[in-house]
Amino acid sequence: MKLIVKMATRSRPEKFKTVLQQYIDFLSGENEVRFVITCDLDDETMNTDDMREWFEETRKSVDLVYRYGHSKTKVEACNADLEDEDGDVLLVVSDDMIPAAMNYDSIIAQGFAEVFPNYDGAIKFNDGLRNDALMTLPCLGWKLYKAIGHCYHPDYTSLYCDDEQTRLCGMLGKLAVCEMIIARHEWIPGDHENADDLHKRNESYYGVDGEVFRRRAENNFDVDEVRERLGLPVPAKS
């Protein structure tokens, strides 16, 4: 299995380095794994000579590419820099998704071999925080990812994008659930005493993104178009 691990980051260089190194250290060595990192050119904490040197040193021991761009939103950053990539599974992580299982790549490989051997589905792993069906750690077969056309729908800024992703995969009949925790979601609300400016900014979009979600839901999240791209039967319109 070839696993693409996508990570977008901003304004948290030390936390980012710690978490990324954990993702590297927790690999089994049994699968092909490539890390794709997206940073912002206007981020003075990440766009530094020291950070670039750290990236170059890390690249000596792992397949990793890092790119600096002009992402205007969290969703845009998550979607960025994947257009020239290819793999079997896409795993989208962040610096608040802390690795919790050694050999997580082999756990993912085994899961897809069991439920989506053609890599045309998604697996929702328990994130250690929520008990509902929401997939907060996107783990998408590459065929499904390409059929959808993005990780998160680009109309969103920060929030509700995972709600759409989860519902769309469920509507397609392409969502499996695994109670194993491969990464623990250490999320804190924007009003928490430890919340930084990025937390607060990302959580300020509830109203805007909530309206996007309602509008997208009225259109069934374009599920029929995705069905067609996957080669699934499309129900006749009444």
Predicted regions and their residues:
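Active-site nucleotide-sugar/metal-binding loop of Leloir-type enzymes
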Residues: 79-89
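Conserved donor NDP-sugar-binding/catalytic core segment of glycosyltransferases
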Residues: 97-98, 102-135, 142
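Active-site beta-to-alpha loop of glycosyltransferases that engages the nucleotide-sugar donor
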Residues: 7-18, 41-43, 72
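A conserved acidic beta->alpha catalytic loop
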Residues: 37-51, 97-98
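Short, acidic, metal-binding catalytic loop of nucleotide-sugar glycosyltransferases
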Residues: 21-32
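Short beta-strand/loop segment that forms part of the nucleotide-sugar
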Residues: 31-44, 67-69
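C-terminal catalytic/acceptor-binding lobe
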Residues: 159, 163-238
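Short beta-strand-to-loop acidic/aromatic patch adjacent to the donor-nucleotide binding site
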Residues: 87-98
